[in-house]
């Protein structure tokens, strides 16, 4: 009887703990369900966007083409095929590279305090450089670990790299491209 009670309590604890869990590590999930999602593809990348943001997606493709030749300068492994997801229904301006699953997400509302280059081009250069950085983490011990735990190994590799180096390198790249 005591074992059954302990098993029931452990099961209840496990169920209560999962209340806050979700399938993704990070999700901006603010897009209306009425969006019809489209995509534009090239050999190197894919832009996923709602049908209402076709103009933003076209500009993003243009900027990706503009920065592609220089984006992996200084790294052994070049950029890789990765989807770029546009989220236009927001009031923030930011970008995010996620590795689980691999993608680059853009909150496409322009920043109020713009710089010398078009805001979207700056964001594309910055976040695309982060994607190249993550791709270069996947070698040596981390690559071996990826055969055991999958894409999460690159995330573990991020713990070995200082944040100031990652951000500084991305800012330097976007500055060099301005």
Language-model regions, residue ranges each:
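Sec-dependent N-terminal signal peptides
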Residues: 4-14
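Cleavable N-terminal export/targeting peptides
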Residues: 6, 22-23
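Cleavable N-terminal signal peptides
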Residues: 11, 21-22, 177
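Juxtacatalytic substrate-recognition/specificity segment
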Residues: 23-156, 162
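Glycine-rich (often Gly-Gly/Gly-Pro-rich) flexible segments and glycine-rich loop motifs
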Residues: 165-167
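Short helix/loop segments within enzyme catalytic domains
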Residues: 172-178
